[in-house]
UniProtKB/Swiss-Prot annotation:
HAMAP family named among the record's database cross-references: Thiosulf_sulfurtr (MF_01009)
Listed name of the protein: Thiosulfate sulfurtransferase GlpE
Catalytic activity: thiosulfate + hydrogen cyanide = thiocyanate + sulfite + 2 H(+); thiosulfate + [thioredoxin]-dithiol = [thioredoxin]-disulfide + hydrogen sulfide + sulfite + 2 H(+)
Native organism: Haemophilus ducreyi (strain 35000HP / ATCC 700724)
Function of the protein: Transferase that catalyzes the transfer of sulfur from thiosulfate to thiophilic acceptors such as cyanide or dithiols. May function in a CysM-independent thiosulfate assimilation pathway by catalyzing the conversion of thiosulfate to sulfite, which can then be used for L-cysteine biosynthesis.
Assigned GO CC terms: cytoplasm
Entry keyword annotation includes Cytoplasm: yes
Length: 110
């Protein structure tokens, strides 16, 4: 059976970040990331992938967030294929995150 990622709600994602040390990766365009992003999120791009690999530990779950929860699925599946064991995609993306009034940060916090 092929490994797959799991879709989770923004609330569950935030709980995993806060209480389980999950690694949150925002894959939206830089301009949108800088406008605001989930608090603590790393801006993951092709260019920052090597840094991502240095930062994330083998034990950490990785949570991927995009605009609406669509693009994050393909990135989550890519990470599973790269050997990450616990990978999640945020259902509804950053739009849903904002609607739930979960914590956001403006600017760059990397």
């Amino acid at each position: 059976m092929a490994a797959i990622f799991t879709e989770i709600s923004p609330t569950t994602a935030w709980q995993l970040v806060k209480h389980e040390n999950a690694f949150l990766a925002d894959i939206r365009a830089l301009a949108h990331y800088l406008d605001d992003h989930p608090s603590g999120a790393f801006h993951l791009t092709n260019d920052s992938y090597a840094e991502f690999l240095d930062l994330v530990s083998d034990e950490q779950a990785v949570i991927v967030v995009c605009y609406h929860g669509i693009s994050s699925r393909s990135v989550a599946q890519f990470l599973v294929e790269q050997g990450f064991e616990t990978v999640y995609s945020v259902t509804g993306g950053f739009e849903a995150w904002q609607k739930l009034a979960l914590p956001v940060t403006k600017g760059c916090d990397q």
